[in-house]
Amino acid sequence: MRPHVVFGNRSEARAFALAQRLPADGIFPQGIDHVLFVLGLFFLAPKWRPLLSQTTAFTIAHTTTLGLSAYGIVSLPTRVVEPLIALSIAYVAVENIWRPRLNTARIVVVFAFGLLHGLGFASSLSEVPMPRDQFFTALLAFNLGVDFGQLAVIAAAFLVVGWFRHCDWYWKGIVVPVCSVIATIGGYWTITRLFA
């Protein structure tokens, strides 16, 4: 159920609806890198505790830099942010294979990568034409849209592979191949974005 929000005028409501719809409209193909990162978090361990710890760290981080960047407090060039986002995808996927355990270091790394993804989200938000007096509404809506998108990706992953997580072959038969593909894509994007 979507949260109920009361608006003072129609233009504010339109701003909210437009900004909240943008993450969903752009999740494929423009936001596929964020989808792959969330899948990387999922495949560390498809259990609620590891997922909750990682997604909470990621959400706090990307919300922070999204807000700071949107208000012009923090800024990095897209040519720097995009390769690093791609590298974050490759990193979490490789770590899932070589060190498949939740620990403090993993949470710190996810938080750091979340800061980068927030800068990427800010770039998408900048595409929404908003009057300045409606900007906070758009920022709130966009962030809610991102969070709904993350939940949708995790729910879809559970529906597709969650049934097999207790099988003996789950790690070798699903996690390793899928994370290998994710890591390869992330590595390829890192190189192509560096030299774009």
Predicted regions and their residues:
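Histidine-/acidic- and/or cysteine-rich, low-complexity loops and terminal segments associated
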Residues: 1-32, 191, 195-196
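Hydrophobic alpha-helical transmembrane segments in multi-pass membrane proteins
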Residues: 25-196
